[in-house]
Regions:
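Short beta-strand edge/turn micro-motifs at domain boundaries
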Residues: 116-148
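Sec/Tat signal peptide C-region and signal peptidase I cleavage site
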Residues: 19-24
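Short, well-ordered alpha-helical segments enriched in acidic and aromatic residues
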Residues: 42-57
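Bacterial N-terminal signal peptides that target proteins for export
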Residues: 1-9
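Surface-exposed, charged secondary-structure patches
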Residues: 71-115
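Bacterial N-terminal signal peptides
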Residues: 8-18
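A short gly/proline-enriched turn/hairpin at secondary-structure junctions
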Residues: 55-68, 81
C-alpha cells in the first residue's frame, strides 16, 4: 500500500472511531427512537435524549413557543402526550448529515391518533445528546397521500 493510500485509510479509520465514541447510537436511530417515544407519549424517554442546555422550538399549533429549560421542555411534552394519547408515527424522508462536531437529522413525520399532527422535524445532536429540536407544524404533510 502506498503512503498516500495508507494515510487516507488511517484518516478514514480515525473518523469512524471518533464517530463511534461520540455517539452511543447513530443519530438517525436516535431520532427514530425519539419520534417513537413522542408517539407513545413516553415523556421520560423523550426528555432523557436531551443534553443539558437543549432547546425545543415548537412552531405552530397550541404549544407554539420556545422551550429552553428541561422543565419547560418536559412540561410541553407532558401537555402534548395528555392531549393526544398514543399516536402512530409515519416517518418519511429521514436524512442525516454529520461531521465530527455533531449531526442533524431531518424528517417529515405525520402523527396519527385522536388527531393528525403533521410535523417537519429537525433534530441536532452533539456528543450523542439532542441539543436542538425544531418541531414545525406542516399542514401540507397531512394532505399528502400515503406512500407504499
Amino acid at each position: 500500500m502506498s503512503v498516500p493510500r495508507l494515510a487516507v485509510s488511517v484518516l478514514a479509520l480515525s473518523a469512524g472511531l471518533a464517530w463511534s465514541t461520540a455517539y452511543a447510537e447513530a443519530p438517525a436511530d436516535a431520532a427514530k427512537a425519539h419520534i417513537e417515544a413522542v408517539a407513545a407519549g413516553q415523556v421520560d424517554a423523550i426528555t432523557a435524549a436531551y443534553g443539558a442546555d437543549a432547546v425545543l422550538e415548537w412552531v405552530g399549533g397550541p404549544l407554539d413557543g420556545r422551550y429552553a429549560t428541561m422543565d419547560a421542555i418536559k412540561a410541553a411534552w407532558t401537555k402534548f402526550a395528555k392531549a393526544n394519547g398514543p399516536l402512530k408515527a409515519d416517518i418519511e424522508h429521514m436524512q442525516e448529515a454529520a461531521n465530527p462536531k455533531g449531526a442533524t437529522v431531518t424528517a417529515d413525520v405525520v402523527f396519527k391518533g385522536k388527531s393528525t399532527v403533521p410535523v417537519r422535524y429537525v433534530l441536532t445532536y452533539r456528543d450523542g445528546k439532542l441539543v436542538d429540536e425544531i418541531w414545525q407544524i406542516d399542514p401540507k404533510l397531512a394532505a399528502k397521500p400515503a406512500s407504499y
